Amino acid sequence: AFALRWMRRDRGSLDFDLPDADLVLGEKGDVVAIVKEVRNEAHRLIEEFMLAANEAVARHLLFVPSPAMYRVHDRPDERKLNDLRAVLEPLGYDIPEDDELVGPTVFQKIIDQAEGKPEERFVSDLVLRAQKKALYAAECRGHYALAAKYYAHFTSPIRRYPDLVVHRALCEWIASGRPPAAAEAESRERWLVDASAQCSERERRAESAEREAQSWKKFVFLSKKVGEEFEAYVSAVVSFGLFITLEGVYADGLLPMDALEDDYYRYEDVEHRLVGASTGRVYRLGDHLRVKLT
């Protein structure tokens, strides 16, 4: 796993090894604890084998050739890169001005630079949000974040339909030993265009439902913690206050402007910060705070 991972890193692959929150459920389905997700070398070993298999199958089907459904990930757009520069450069993280020079290695360097620092999680979250959403497509356009020319989802056919589509294409080639006839290939390509779009849309809906369910479970759990204090960091600065993320729980909330009672704060949108009129105290993205849940 270590060798495979470093082979990917050498070619420019981007690794988001972000810890997440695991919801521990009781017998009645209620959340009894929120703990940090455990990721060890066994998880990484399986992940590397899955990535290697996905790449190998995508490459094979492309060069057979046999129509298939690919997993594609495009470059970040200009607006998101500019937003990322505006936030990270004042913190000492450099992003080339020429967007064409911003490859996944640039983002990996930023993540590595932030490792072990107070803003590590915040910086990784920002870099992740700057990326485009990966999609399914009938054409192989490569995977930007993985620095892979060929990529498909192949390893989970029992729970993900695109993987089943890829399995069927591979099994058909193994059985026949030749690519499909031109007319059949053209018909399948047309079907894959529509199927890929639907799979991408269904994936977005499923992820949205999952996030909503987790947020609700966290809300119910935290409603019993009102009055307790938590470590948090600033995830967004707006004209009416600070959006914060509770560390360890990874739940988001708002610290409204009127809760900052020590001064009158003005919002500076270019620098994405709040500045105290009398004290000069500054609240900016990534700042760590201790907050009380109300």
Task: State each model region's role.
Residues A1-E261, G286, K292:
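Electropositive polyanion-binding surfaces
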Residues L254-T294:
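Intrinsically disordered, low-complexity linker and terminal regions at domain boundaries
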